[in-house]
């Protein structure tokens, strides 16, 4: 492992200190809790939407979350290892066949729905036993 890769790995470990980032994929509905600083106050703001893209680049990894707010589509890019991220919660698993869901930008209403990935009972029982 070269020097830059070692430094990046150390920074990732430092950024994850005490935090866990769940496994999520494009199509999943997530709630991203973001630390927002307003003046001298600090609060947590929740941003819920569908993950339309994930970019895995080590320390520079990010993901794009899209939601519909007041009839307008809003996309926000989050750095995966940012200290501003308080937590990420996966609310619903989506069943999609693409890595990038940019086609959802042109769609609205029923055509923008994503099928839910149902987990079999065998897998949930095995996961709970481990």
Swiss-Prot record:
**Entry keyword Ribosomal protein:** yes
| InterPro entries hit by this protein | Ribosomal_bL19, Ribosomal_bL19_CS, Ribosomal_bL19_sf, Translation_prot_SH3-like_sf
Does this UniProt record's set of keywords contain Ribonucleoprotein? Answer: yes
Some GO term, biological process aspect, for this entry: which one?
A: translation
Gene Ontology CC annotation, any one: cytosolic large ribosomal subunit
**What Gene3D superfamilies does its record include?**
2.30.30.790
A GO molecular function annotation here is: structural constituent of ribosome
Task: Enumerate the UniProt keywords alphabetically.
Answer: Ribonucleoprotein, Ribosomal protein
UniProt cross-references to PANTHER family, sorted A to Z: LARGE RIBOSOMAL SUBUNIT PROTEIN BL19M, RIBOSOMAL PROTEIN L19
So what does this one do? Answer: This protein is located at the 30S-50S ribosomal subunit interface and may play a role in the structure and function of the aminoacyl-tRNA binding site.
Query: Which family does this protein fall into?
Result: Belongs to the bacterial ribosomal protein bL19 family.
Q: NCBIfam families, from UniProt?
A: rplS_bact
This chain belongs to which protein, by name? Large ribosomal subunit protein bL19
Q: Which organism is it from?
A: Burkholderia lata (strain ATCC 17760 / DSM 23089 / LMG 22485 / NCIMB 9086 / R18194 / 383)
Give me the gene this protein comes from: rplS
């Amino acid at each position: 492992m070269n020097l830059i890769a070692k430094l990046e790995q150390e920074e990732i470990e430092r950024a994850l200190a005490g935090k866990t980032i769940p496994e999520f994929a494009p199509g999943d509905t997530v709630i991203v809790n973001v630390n927002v600083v307003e003046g001298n106050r600090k609060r947590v703001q929740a941003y819920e939407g569908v993950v339309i893209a994930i970019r895995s680049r080590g320390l520079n990894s990010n993901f794009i979350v899209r939601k519909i707010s007041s009839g307008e589509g809003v996309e926000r890019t989050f750095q995966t290892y940012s200290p501003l991220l308080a937590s990420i919660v996966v609310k619903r698993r989506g069943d999609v066949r693409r890595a990038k869901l940019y086609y959802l930008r042109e769609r609205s209403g029923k055509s923008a729905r994503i099928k839910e990935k149902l987990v079999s009972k065998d897998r949930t029982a095995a996961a709970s036993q481990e």
